[in-house]
Amino acid sequence: MKQQYSTISLLLLTLLFLLSCGSKDPIDYWGQNKQKEEQENNKEIENKTDKPRYIWIDAAANFPDFANSKEAITRDLTLAKDAGFTDIVVDVRPTCGDVLFKTSMVEQVKYQYAWTSTGYTKIDRTAKWDYLQAFIDAARKLDLKVHAGINTFVGGNTMNNGTGMVYRDESKRAWTTQMSTAQGIVSIMDEAEPTKFLNPANPKVQTFLCNLLRDLAKYDLDGIVLDRGRYLDLRADFSDLSRKKFETYLGSKISNFPEDILPKGATKLSGKSSDYTKKWLEFRAKTIRDFMEKARNAVKSVNSKIQFGVYVGGWYSTYYTVGVNWGSPNFKTSDYYRWATKNYHSFGYADLMDQMLIGAYASPLLVYGNTEWTMQGFCLQAMSKIKGSCPKVVGGPDVGNWDTANKATQEQENQAIVQSVKACMDACNGYFLFDMIHLKKANQWKYAKEGIAKAIEKTNQ
């Protein structure tokens, strides 16, 4: 009888072993479809009432109110505080590349274009007071934390027939990115791209930006957030400088550039790739990580207490197109995405960050879920990829540009704001909303307030 029980036990153990060792799910070739991803045993994040709630304040969009009025700044920060936000991110370097803080590195912003009741309007800044300092002063009185946001690898835009340092200064114009187009490699200055990106691999660009960050870190800030700390897209950068740096990285010459890497003008990967394609993606990710390390050191050299961080889009599966690996170096990217080399994970930069703002920019009809292109899913996936390397990961929606097809009713959009707070806060370390202007224009403060109140109620249960 003992032998019979032993035999049965052995059979059961064998069956359980076989069931537990089912075949792996196939990996989507470029990882751009709805792939099953590692959840990394996402431990339930402890809910706390002190989870931060960030609201972004875009410079251009809010310029009609804030460019020349401290009273308007105080008024709207009071509304943010009343709604339950704990942190503000003040954009002080819009895409023109000029700034709204004190520095000798570049000129002050003189004007911005914004949508007003009379259309797309030029708003001049005539005030002489310090824009960033005005936000800091108002925020401190309200017990709000203040973070300065900058557009990083940009130097101008096409507004007003060209605005920014790359239009004023020929030496800076040489810093702009060289794009691969169907017609060949051309400067972004000769293309219709509205934002003029700089080449992240250019040492002069990196030095300039680090010096700019040192000046910014002199302010009484809680944090600094880098936006657009990336390449334009897959078409950039194909300058001679980038080619030489890539060849040095490879340890060999490329005879047919850029075709040996990507077809001319390619904006996405095709089913076939050359031996150099994935190595090029790795090189770009390394370039961005190396810069982020320099930028962090620049900030910390002035004030070690400032939280250094980034804004990134939550769509990690395609974020390689802009040269960024925002995951943890411990997240083995190539286990899930065929576009990644075995070494791609080494250039994840989450471990360099004190805080990360994740754009969970899904439709108002897609608040809940586990995958990308749902708000909750963006946050869950981000936590899975960051793997604790960054201590503060906050995510949330763009509440003004989330329904371009106009599929949601106004009430559905209102309720999506309410629902988004708890959905995102439960999935990560806090909440992030873009942008203040949208809440103001649609008079939606009350929905943000309701959502924050419900999320905090959950934490008190």
Language-model features and meaning:
Residues 65-81, 205-215, 332-349, 409-423:
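Short, acidic/polar
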Residues 85-127:
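Aromatic-lined carbohydrate-binding/catalytic grooves of carbohydrate-active enzymes
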Residues 47-67, 148-219, 270-277:
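Active-site-adjacent "subsite" loops/lids of carbohydrate-active enzymes
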Residues 72-98, 219-223, 346-358, 427-431:
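Catalytic domains of carbohydrate-active enzymes, especially glycoside hydrolases
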